Regions:
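NAD(P)-dependent short-chain dehydrogenase/reductase
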Residues: 145-193, 198-200, 234-235
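NAD(P)H-binding glycine-rich loop region in Rossmannoid oxidoreductase-like domains
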Residues: 36, 49-87, 95-97
């Protein structure tokens, strides 16, 4: 079969493309940025998802669409969140309608906001910031189009992703730990907090694809503890002199919101409004389907940190492409190093 991956040059889309290629599938990527390391066997189409004509042309001969193109919280894109994550998603779904066998939509845990845990597919949607609201509206737009045209729809909602090559805000965390700088949590950090390894996520993704069973799949680690435990265990693994320090939740959130508004911090509302609260999925439904995740929170943090150290120079030089695959500026967060 032939697959079209929107956002296929991004961190996750790139992994999906390589896994499909390794499985003997034909792959076409649609993205505004071309990864220079893209294998020649993977076809590339330079196109914005808001370009209906270009997207329609890219659909020719496609059996399955994998919609991963999106603006992520780190981009702080304001009104463009709606233009890309909502309007762009609708355009991709409309251009796929009546032409493909199935549509797989990459959603986000941000659609839930900050609900009671564990989170299931039945948990109400209550996004609390601009990114989550745009992702939810985009998902609902895709669902509306797919239902209207009878397109089989699978929705994947991952927890925060870790793994080799994942940079973004994790690059700041890893640099601080490597330098022995103290790291900070909002509140005491003693909240159950789930991540997901990119490899486990792709395994779940491919399982859903193979089963051909439309529906919603929430994907997160099966083994995890608190956020503080994950960070303290990583510091121990790194043999670092860093310490995990607590910031009072109220003042910290107000300060980070002001810095965000002024464009002085890389942290977006999704980060500072949720990382001090419990957040984890119930993944029993996936386990019953045969999904076998390999990584705990601690495992994935260790592997990601070790990859970062081994590839630090190249990772620091990356300036183009997905925000999750390149360096992020600290902004005024560097001041925390001075006062810690």
């Amino acid at each position: 079969m032939k697959h079209l991956i929107t956002g296929g040059s991004g961190f996750l889309g790139n992994l999906i493309a390589h896994r499909l290629l390794a499985s003997g599938e034909e792959v076409r990527i649609l993205d505004i940025w071309e990864d220079p390391s893209r294998p020649p066997e993977i076809e590339f189409v330079r196109c914005d998802v808001r370009d209906a004509t270009g997207v329609g042309n890219a659909m020719r001969g496609i059996d399955i669409v994998h919609h991963n193109a999106a603006l992520v919280p780190l981009t702080k894109s304001g009104k463009d969140f709606a233009r890309v994550n909502i309007d762009g998603s609708r355009i991709v779904a409309e251009q796929a309608a009546g032409r493909v066998r199935a549509f797989i939509h990459m959603s986000s845990s941000a659609v839930y906001g900050s609900p009671a845990c564990p989170i299931t597919a039945e948990t109400p949607y209550r996004p609390i910031e601009i990114y989550g609201r745009a992702k939810l509206a985009g998902e609902l737009a895709v669902r509306e189009v797919c239902e209207k045209h009878g397109t089989a729809l699978t929705v994947i909602r991952p927890r925060t992703i870790l793994g080799p090559g994942r940079l973004g805000i994790f690059q700041i965390l890893f640099e601080w730990i490597a330098a022995g700088q103290n790291i900070f949590v909002i509140g005491d950090g003693n909240v159950k907090f789930q991540f997901v390894h990119a490899g486990d996520l792709i395994d779940a993704y491919m399982l859903a694809l193979r089963l051909g069973k439309p529906g919603i799949y929430n994907v997160g680690a099966a083994r995890f503890g608190t956020l503080r435990e994950a960070l303290e265990n990583l510091v121990c693994h790194a043999h670092s002199t860093s310490r995990v320090r607590s910031l009072p939740a109220g003042p910290a959130i107000r300060t980070l919101r002001a810095l965000d508004f002024l464009g002085l911090s890389p942290l977006a509302p999704w980060h500072y409004l949720t990382y001090h609260k419990p957040f984890y999925f119930d993944v029993n439904a996936l386990l019953q389907l045969g999904w076998r995740p390999r990584y705990s929170n601690d495992d994935m943090f260790r592997e990601s940190y070790d990859w970062f150290l081994a590839n630090r120079r190249a990772a620091g030089a990356a300036k183009d492409g997905s925000p999750h695959r390149r360096r992020v500026r600290e902004g005024v967060l560097w001041l925390l190093k001075k006062i810690a």
